[in-house]
Amino acid sequence: KTVACGMNAVFPSGISVGLLGRNGAGKSTLLKLIAGSADPTSGHVITNGRISFPVGFAGSFHPDMTGAQNTRFVARIYGADTSALIDYVADFADLDIHFHLPFRTYSAGMKSRLAFGVSMGLKFDTYLIDEITAVGDARFKQKSQQIFMDRLTTAGAVFVSHSNGMLRELCTAGAVIE
């Protein structure tokens, strides 16, 4: 299926852009192209600055490594201070002793908290967000929203969603993908 043909788009730095579209419109594929985790069949993608992996994405964590080991691994990939990121994620994700247990033993909520903590512990110029879903109890949701809003004071974001309301709340620009 062709997702974009002859497409040219500019996402300005420091701006939160929302992409709205129905299922199958190509929103997530476009995010993968921007992230560099997928290649276009023709043409090219030009990015400037540090672009995040999709915020909260836990799919690349190794199931047999602990939360701390996975965090250390990601820190090394991104050239971050490993000790600082581990301390940040341990405090932020509220995993207690589970942070030192294999990732495969985590509940879905624990996996999401670890992934979101790692995402927020790394500084990017642009954050990529594919269908934000709030995880955890009310206190964790509030803490997550606050830290994310803090990040957006110094960075931009590209959001994809089905939810018009969510995009209106978080974005300063937008487009509809057909």
Language-model segments: which ranges?
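Conserved H-loop
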Residues: 163-170
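Conserved structural motif at the start of ABC-family nucleotide-binding domains
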Residues: 4-6
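Conserved catalytic loops of ABC-family nucleotide-binding domains
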Residues: 147-162
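ABC-family P-loop ATPase nucleotide-binding domains
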Residues: 50-146
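H-loop (His-switch) and adjacent beta-strand-loop-beta switch element
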Residues: 170-178
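Conserved catalytic/dimer-interface elements of ABC ATPase nucleotide-binding domains
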Residues: 38, 133, 175
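ABC ATPase nucleotide-binding domain signature region
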Residues: 13-76
